[in-house]
Amino acid sequence: MPITGTVLRRFITKGVIPMCQVAPLSTSAEGSTNLKEVLSKKIPAHNAKVKSFRAEHGNTVVQSVNIDMIYGGMRSMKGMVTETSVLDPEEGIRFRGYSIPECQKLLPKAKGGEEPLPEAIWWLLCTGDVPSEAQTAAITKEWNARADLPTHVVRMLDNFPDNLHPMAQFIAAIAALNNESKFAGAYARGVAKASYWEYAYEDSMDLLAKLPTVAAIIYRNLYRDGSAVSVIDPKKDWSANFSSMLGYDDPLFAELMRLYLVIHSDHEGGNVSAHTSHLVGSALSDPYLAFSAAMAGLAGPLHGLANQEVLVFLNKIVGEIGFNYTEEQLKEWVWKHLKSGQVVPGYGHAVLRKTDPRYECQREFALKHLPNDDLFKLVSTLYKITPGILLEQGKAKNPWPNVDSHSGVLLQYFGMTEMSFYTVLFGVSRALGCLSQLIWARGMGLPLERPKSHSTEGLIKLAMAAKK
């Protein structure tokens, strides 16, 4: 029996308005293994709740906006509705109200495995319910059945030059799939707006099914001499098939992929990739085009390059002081690095004010499976000394490690040393969040996003008027 999503115990103090992103959904179709059927019950129920909420509180002020927020990238500005996840500064990400440790405990796992299946987090993100084994297996079966790539996309990937970045190839392939868009076809036929989500759902399921194959072809073309990608095994889950297609048959690597794909899947709606997907989708571009645009955002170094920068940082340490260092030597090295005007990559976060739970679960994986790996031991020692150094320096609001501080080391351990491909892995994972958000955006009938912009002169006038 599915477990209904819990409500976070966080309230906006004035007016005591609950944060809607993780409110419980109806469970009218619980037990069904047909995700689309389940959503067909939940979406109308949620829309009725939103309608009632807006009727009562539509004019309630939840935040004032100052000039610095406008110039500062709208950071922390409350301006979006995202139902799938909430980032708590103290607890980290919650997927539909569930923390990462709760997801690790409650979500179905592969037979003999210990990490949650991405198919299960997809069900949770879409419905707010922890799926049963049967519901999770139904997603696996459906993705395996939808995984074939059209010939033109395979040919395009095979004809890309070797020096074209893997993210550029990934973005192009996703966009090229849009000739199969059911959403675009339905819109052209003039289907009712209330049905948009159904076609967004179909495109999202198709795209999720195909992304591992797209990513694997890119990987093998660039780094494995163009060797053929293995066919989908209907007996394997999404992550196991992805691992095999990449050329990694170690069951433990498949376990790492399950963990990686789950913990990177969603992170609210304001990050660059999720916001881009939402923005482009709000113009009623189909999910292929919206997600392709999202991946262009993820390709930016400020969003998707962080785990690579951590590895460069670690290799720099090893190159200068080796692996036979003392804690004191490492402290001296970090201080020297900071005093030269540089930062410690993988530490700090725009929202979080504690160690990222996504870091912690990767650390637990490493402690269990690769405790004696030299790079992992370096990461562990940095975890021990760096927060204190950053606090003493006095510049960091959050001196604790984030998810990017660890993921690259795990991939390196299993032999995936091609850092330029890591963002593609991130993209495959982030599809789970972006596309579940997109389905709900269409289901809720969210409008075209169109904020008001001002020139600096216009803001000066507004500021002067506000002071009168």
Swiss-Prot record:
Transmembrane segments: none annotated. Its EC number is 2.3.3.16. GO terms for cellular component: mitochondrial matrix. Pfam families: Citrate_synt (PF00285). The active site is at 303, 349, 404. It is found in: Mitochondrion matrix. It catalyses: oxaloacetate + acetyl-CoA + H2O = citrate + CoA + H(+). One of its GO terms (molecular function) is citrate (Si)-synthase activity. InterPro entries: Citrate_synth-like_lrg_a-sub (IPR016142), Citrate_synth-like_sm_a-sub (IPR016143), Citrate_synthase (IPR002020), Citrate_synthase_AS (IPR019810), Citrate_synthase_euk (IPR010109), Citrate_synthase_sf (IPR036969). CDD domains: ScCit1-2_like. Keywords: Mitochondrion, Transferase, Transit peptide, Tricarboxylic acid cycle. The keyword Transit peptide applies. Pathway: Carbohydrate metabolism; tricarboxylic acid cycle; isocitrate from oxaloacetate: step 1/2. Belongs to the citrate synthase family. Citrate synthase is found in nearly all cells capable of oxidative metabolism. Homodimer. This is Probable citrate synthase, mitochondrial. It comes from Caenorhabditis briggsae.
